[in-house]
Regions:
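Extended hydrophobic leader/signal-anchor segments used for secretion and membrane insertion
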Residues: 1-105
Length: 105
């Protein structure tokens, strides 16, 4: 699936206007960028970094904790509804990602 980034919560790895390719149902490891359903508003998707998996789901965090309007597991707790793992940022062409970008090592 394709997802467009909005907001500044994932800077510097992702910026508003970036387009991502997401593999639905892919295995997730700590450090991966993921797309999940926002708890309390399941029609809205969020892009966050998976930090750890516990008994109640994944703890998801924003890279930019100071972003206005940022919401992550610090606000709503662990998340069970992970839609998929970000595979790559495909647009815009030529922009390098931040040191914690989307490449998987």
């Amino acid at each position: 699936m394709r997802v467009r980034v909005e907001g500044d919560s994932m800077r510097p790895a992702l910026v508003p206007g970036d387009w991502l390719l997401v593999r639905r149902g892919a295995a997730v490891r700590p450090g991966d960028l993921v797309v999940a359903r926002l708890p309390g508003d399941p029609d809205r998707l969020i892009v966050k970094r998976a930090q750890w998996h516990g008994a109640d789901g994944w703890w998801l965090e924003s890279d930019n904790q100071r972003a206005g309007g940022r919401r992550d597991s610090w606000d709503f707790g662990p998340v069970e509804d992970i839609v998929g793992r970000v595979v790559l940022r495909y647009w815009p062409l030529g922009r390098r990602h931040g040191k914690r970008g989307v490449k998987r090592g």
